[in-house]
Design a protein with these regions (language model features):
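Negatively charged
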Residues: 31-483
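Gram-positive cell-envelope targeting signals
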Residues: 1-43
Length: 483
């Protein structure tokens, strides 16, 4: 009987221990699952006690103060001598003193006994800390971060960002203005970043003029909707590989390469631009590019092409002949300053919706001919300086143009010193033109169809008509009389 009782007790103990083990495993599993789930979701209202999480970015920035020059994220044990006697400030989101900030002069130590987890919201963490020169992220986990917008924006003296290459960015969705206006940065190793969830790259490297190279060739951009201004003003970049970027979801790419004036080559030939609406300023100021393959770009949805190739002064050729421009409303300054182009085929472009043609071909002074005869211009209101400085054009056929809605034609042909003939048809109308000053200035070889020669006293719209001889002089020739 006693042996039986002992056996029962032994079995009960074993069962009890087994149940306790199961409970322990389930409890740990639940806690870890909760941690993993909240880490993946990026829950900003963290209530985790299992990790040491920083306060949100802007709050930390305000705690650091604007005079800080160096910031170190580290383990407490590694900096005990440096922080001895300094009263710390709690900067953990739980407010339990798990992460402490020690200010020593202008240097800040942000320390914990364990790993420091960045808050999911890192917005403006170091925003406009204009004295900041160095940040060391030795003990800094970004695995929960979803928002990095403006994190280093305006850190004009920042020269060193340590241990950033290994950041876990798999949950980040917003990198807008991440390094904007960090002109002192000369190198950044971001090649290993996981950008699969990033939706916004707007202005990420805006005005990082000190960068000479940047490896983003392996970035996954499949989720990105806005790549506008991404490399805006990166005038020091001599090479940039974005050839394999997937921009299928992008709708905005305005000024993405603005003033990347040191780039001599750029491969964007495989980009799918079908969803892009705004291409304004895309290559504005890429003055060292000698060639550019955009011939297969899908432009059917584009509404704005203003400043697109402005000041691409080294481009000798450009194939945009098959572009669909039927939705474009703005071509302001599109080819301004493309002074090395010797030919440009835009003959089949549908310009029916274009209202702004201001400076469109200005200073394309190596073009000897340009066929815009079939362009539809009924929506155009502004033709200011459209052919200004096209000094090698000898003839222009504008016979298909309807200019009844144009209000500004001032300087339209100014500086076209070799222009002899301008052919127009019945659609040419200047009744609504209110600004026409210097329309034909310096067009000394221009001659109307009935023999009217250039007269420096008549350079406004008064002679912008088909030549009717001495009784009705004009500088144009009826298309019916074209040889």
């Amino acid at each position: 009987m006693k042996n039986f009782t002992k056996k029962i007790r032994s079995k009960s103990i074993i069962v009890l221990l087994s149940l306790l083990s199961v409970f322990f495993v389930l409890s740990v599993t639940f806690t870890m699952s909760k941690y993993v789930i909240e880490k993946q979701v990026g829950n900003i209202t963290l209530n985790l006690t299992s990790v040491d999480t920083l306060i949100p970015g802007l709050q930390l920035r305000n705690t650091l103060g604007t005079s800080v020059t160096e910031v170190v994220f580290g383990k407490t044990e590694d900096y005990e001598s440096e922080i001895a006697g300094i009263e710390p400030i709690n900067v953990d989101v739980q407010k339990k003193g798990k992460i402490k900030l020690y200010a020593k002069g202008t240097k800040a130590y942000i320390l914990s006994d364990r790993k420091i987890y960045a808050n999911p919201d890192c917005w403006h963490t170091f925003y406009e800390l204009t004295e900041l020169t160095s940040v060391d992220f030795s003990n800094f986990d970004t695995g929960m971060v979803t928002n990095m917008r403006g994190m280093f924006r305006g850190c004009t003296k920042l020269t060193e960002v340590k241990n950033i290459s290994s950041w876990d960015t798999k949950n980040v969705e917003d990198m807008e203005f991440l390094f904007r206006d960090c002109p002192s940065l000369v190198s950044l190793d971001l090649s290993g970043w996981n950008t699969a969830k990033v939706k916004i790259l707007y202005g990420t490297f805006y005005n990082c003029v000190g960068l000479t190279s940047l490896d983003v060739s392996g970035w996954n951009t499949a989720s990105v909707k806005n790549i506008g201004d991404t490399f805006y003003g990166c005038s020091g970049l001599t090479s940039l590989d974005v050839s394999n970027w997937n921009i299928d979801k992008a709708t905005q790419m305005h000024y993405i390469f603005y003033n990347c004036s040191s780039l001599t080559s750029l491969d964007v030939s495989k980009w799918n631009t079908a969803g892009v609406a705004d291409m304004s300023g895309t290559f504005f100021g890429c003055s060292s590019l000698t060639s550019l393959n955009v011939s297969s770009w899908d432009t059917a949805g584009v509404t704005d092409m203003s400043h697109m190739f402005r000041n691409c002064g080294s481009l000798t050729s450009l194939d945009v002949s098959s572009w669909d421009t039927s939705d474009v409303a703005n071509m302001n300054n599109m080819f301004l300053g493309c002074g090395s182009l010797t030919s440009l085929d835009v003959s089949s472009w549908d310009t029916g919706k274009v209202s702004n043609m201001r400076n469109l071909f200005r200073d394309c002074n190596k073009l000897t001919a340009i066929d815009v005869s079939s362009w539809s211009t009924e929506s155009a209101t502004d033709m200011f300086c459209m052919f200004y400085g096209c000094g090698n054009l000898t003839a222009l056929d504008l016979s298909g143009w309807n200019t009844g809605n144009v209000t500004d034609m001032s300087h339209i042909f100014l500086g076209c010193g070799r222009l002899v003939s301008v052919y127009v048809g019945s659609g040419w109308n200047t009744d609504n033109v209110s600004s026409s000053g210097k329309m034909f200035e310096q067009c000394k070889k221009l001659k109307g169809g009935k023999g009217t020669s250039y007269d420096s006293a008549h350079t406004d719209k008064a002679y912008a008509r088909i030549d009717g001889g001495t009784e009705n002089p004009g500088y144009f020739t009826d298309i019916a009389d074209k040889p």
